[in-house]
């Protein structure tokens, strides 16, 4: 059960990282004025903050909770 929970949390965090990386790439490649995102720099900065947040959480998970039992 612990292994299943660990893998689920790890996948959740990595999925969020991938989502926000994709958002930055889309924003950078399609920098067209959109009503919801008029300030491209601010939008990308927010996405980078979310990437950093999820990467920090993933690092903590791997540092403190990854054991041989989980592998």
Residues of each region from the PLM?
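Extended, charge-rich alpha-helical interface modules
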Residues: 1-71
């Amino acid at each position: 059960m612990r292994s299943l929970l660990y893998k689920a949390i790890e996948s959740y965090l990595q999925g969020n990282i991938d989502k926000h990386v994709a958002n930055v790439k889309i924003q950078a490649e399609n920098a067209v004025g959109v009503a919801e995102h008029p300030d491209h720099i601010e939008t990308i900065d927010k996405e980078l903050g979310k990437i950093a947040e999820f990467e920090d959480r993933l690092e903590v998970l791997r540092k403190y909770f990854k054991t041989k039992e989980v592998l």
